[in-house]
A protein has these predicted regions:
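Beta-propeller fold recognition
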Residues: 1-113, 119-222
């Protein structure tokens, strides 16, 4: 439409009723057919005066003609508790693994993804270790803010950014004592450090890292 520039041809189409979706952590993954896309959002249940995350993920099939009602995957594991918190959701490079984290939960959610059906399986929730943020007045709750995450090119490792630390999780290692590795912490005094932010893999297969507030004109990479 619009000479290839795009155009809104339908609006206000209701595709989800009764349930609502989390504000953050929307991500897309190409369908196995190579043409269509899956749009993925976590959901929350609403009751008057209470917002609570449900243990399910909605996957919408997006084609060139329409957006279809979601495929719903239910989980026993509790996901994230606050719909209004920031976070990040990602797929690995071949779209077979999904991971998500939400600021303030100090948890990482991991699952397999079927690009043919849009269904998740084999869910697992990790508790992210805390490290001292070197703030004598506040050494715990700030570092529980898991801001972002990204897979390594091989998918063996998952990198997680916290306010003052970068961690590596070996998802093939079932021993929590050896699966975690501390990659980086502060490179200056805590009160001058801008805090780590989202992660994203580049075309060069390096994992790039931003900073909260964007007060630096540079990025780091792993």
């Amino acid at each position: 439409a619009n000479g290839g520039a795009g155009k809104v041809i339908q609006r206000s189409k209701i595709i989800v009723e009764q349930d609502s979706m989390l504000k953050a952590m929307m991500i897309a993954c190409r369908h196995a057919n190579g043409k269509d896309w899956w749009l993925v959002k976590q959901m929350y249940e609403y009751s008057p005066g209470n917002l609570k995350s449900k243990n399910k993920i909605a996957t919408f099939l997006v084609t060139k003609d329409s957006v279809y009602p979601p495929v719903i995957t239910y989980f026993q594991d509790f996901l994230f508790s606050d719909y209004d918190q920031a976070g990040q959701a990602i797929f690995n490079q071949d779209g077979t693994k999904y991971a998500a984290t939400c600021r303030g939960t100090n948890k990482v959610f991991l699952a397999d993804f079927d690009r043919c059906t849009g269904i998740f399986s084999n869910p697992k929730t990790y508790n992210v270790p805390n490290y001292s943020c070197h703030n004598p007045n506040d050494s715990s709750w700030v570092d529980s803010f898991t801001h972002g995450l990204e897979f390594s090119p091989s998918t063996q490792f998952l990198y997680i950014s916290k306010s003052y630390n970068i961690l590596q999780l070996d998802i093939t290692d079932n021993d929590s004592a050896t699966a975690w590795y501390h990659v980086a912490g502060l490179d200056t005094a805590w009160n001058y450090f801008p805090k780590y932010s989202r992660l994203s893999i580049g075309y060069d297969n390096k994992v790039y890292l931003g900073y909260v507030g964007a007060i630096r004109n540079t990025m780091s990479h792993i």
